């Protein structure tokens, strides 16, 4: 399982990526595929530590309308494989992240979600992780909605 700090960092990175790519991507999608290796993961269902290698696919969009409304979107799909220790099980990792930010001046709405499936080959348990965050800030800068969820399951 990816640690909560890793997930929070990924969400922060997603927000920063949206902001940094905004000028270059006005009204366009920026797509990239990035290979990775040695990314730590943990199957908390059986305490396997896994070193995952694979590819991260990202798509970022940014647009504004004449009224000054800004919409940013970040989607990523991570696909990887690894071997768990101490079990020796082969794993397939699939993770999807989605972030949306809608804003006008201080007022904004943010939504982030992640679903990660760590699939063990053989008799070992699979892990599913889901996280969500929803934040709404009104024009006065007051947070009117702030919810988050974190759920794991083994099967």
Which positions does each model-derived feature cover?
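Bacterial N-terminal signal peptides that target proteins for export
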Residues: 2-12
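Sec/Tat signal peptide C-region and signal peptidase I cleavage site
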Residues: 21-27
């Amino acid at each position: 399982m990816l640690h909560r700090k890793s997930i929070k960092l990924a969400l922060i990175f997603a927000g920063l990526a949206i902001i940094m790519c905004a000028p270059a991507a006005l009204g366009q999608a920026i797509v990239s595929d990035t290979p990775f290796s040695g990314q730590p993961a943990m199957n908390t269902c059986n305490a396997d530590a896994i070193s995952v290698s694979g590819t991260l696919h990202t798509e970022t969009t940014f647009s504004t309308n004449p009224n000054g409304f800004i919409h940013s979107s970040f989607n990523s799909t991570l696909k990887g494989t690894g071997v768990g220790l101490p079990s020796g099980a082969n794993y397939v990792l699939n993770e999807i992240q989605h972030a949306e930010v809608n804003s006008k001046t201080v007022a904004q709405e943010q939504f982030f979600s992640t679903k990660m499936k760590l699939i063990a080959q053989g008799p070992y348990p699979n892990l599913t992780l889901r996280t969500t965050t929803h934040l709404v800030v009104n024009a006065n800068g007051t947070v009117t909605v702030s919810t988050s969820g974190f759920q794991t399951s083994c099967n």
